[in-house]
């Protein structure tokens, strides 16, 4: 089960294409637009509705995807689980929003006690706002909610984890991953990835195999103008949750598609990139 929060940066837009193409791998509980220290309403903002073209393109290719696996969620299912979160400023968590309320609804649902991976592709502020609402309105349920939660942050792109989540929820020892290994899959990949990986990220390969004549969803993928891979810095957040047989979800220090993590002694159950 996954909940995605994203600030709509251009590499988030690349990651959302891959996320939708892999949507059969998890139960998607919510896709929420959030903010970060880099992007919020009025500052390098992609727009409150930046997800709409991607969901529309997914609807166009859904029937073809479903031929390969009926587990792909319907476009209507995804649309009903997409909402605008806290986006007014960096670290915004002052008010409840449709996005934070959607997260609250999922976390308080007692009909399903399976773990939920809450991913912050931008700042974790909308997640923080949801948790604050639960603390204020349902304090007796905090322990049960925390037991289901797993956190995966691509960096800490605002201060709400340190200022709210960790101080108020840290006592529950929620498994938490803060990753900086995304750099291998981000803007400076040409300097970081080994040379043998470069051919499938070059423009000729990308144009031939992804960008051109591969349907409306792939056509939205924001590579460089010449077709070169740009960045998917947020993809490790969901790649970690893909069941590859490596059991990295159970033990992140074993390593998986989202990276290999190193356990910290303080706070307990925090994992950082190794």
Question: How would you describe each model-predicted region?
Answer:
Residues 1-274:
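N-terminal acidic, glycine/proline-rich low-complexity segments
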């Amino acid at each position: 089960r996954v909940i995605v929060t994203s600030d709509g940066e251009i590499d988030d837009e690349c990651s959302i294409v891959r996320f939708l193409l892999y949507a059969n791998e998890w139960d998607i509980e919510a896709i929420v637009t959030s903010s970060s220290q880099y992007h919020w309403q009025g500052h390098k903002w992609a727009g409150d509705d930046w997800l709409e073209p991607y969901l529309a393109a997914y609807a166009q290719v859904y029937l073809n995807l479903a031929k390969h696996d009926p587990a792909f969620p319907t476009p209507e299912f995804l649309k009903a689980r997409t909402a605008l979160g806290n986006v007014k400023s960096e670290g915004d968590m002052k008010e409840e929003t449709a996005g934070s309320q959607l997260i609250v609804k999922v976390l308080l649902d007692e009909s399903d006690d399976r773990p939920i991976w809450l991913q912050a592709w931008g700042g974790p502020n909308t997640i923080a706002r949801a948790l604050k609402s639960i603390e204020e309105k349902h304090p007796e349920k905090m322990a049960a909610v925390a037991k289901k939660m797993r956190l995966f942050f691509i960096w800490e792109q605002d201060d709400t984890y340190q200022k709210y989540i960790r101080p108020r929820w840290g006592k529950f020892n929620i498994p938490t991953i803060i990753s900086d290994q995304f750099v291998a899959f981000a803007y400076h990949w040409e300097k970081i990835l080994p040379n043998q990986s470069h051919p499938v990220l070059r423009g000729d390969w990308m144009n031939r195999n992804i960008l051109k004549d591969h349907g409306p969803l792939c056509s939205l993928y924001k590579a460089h103008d010449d077709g070169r891979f740009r960045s998917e810095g947020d993809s490790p957040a969901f790649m970690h949750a893909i069941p590859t047989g490596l059991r990295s979800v159970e033990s992140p220090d074993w390593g998986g598609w989202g990276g290999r993590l190193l356990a910290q002694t303080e706070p307990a159950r925090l994992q950082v990139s190794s």
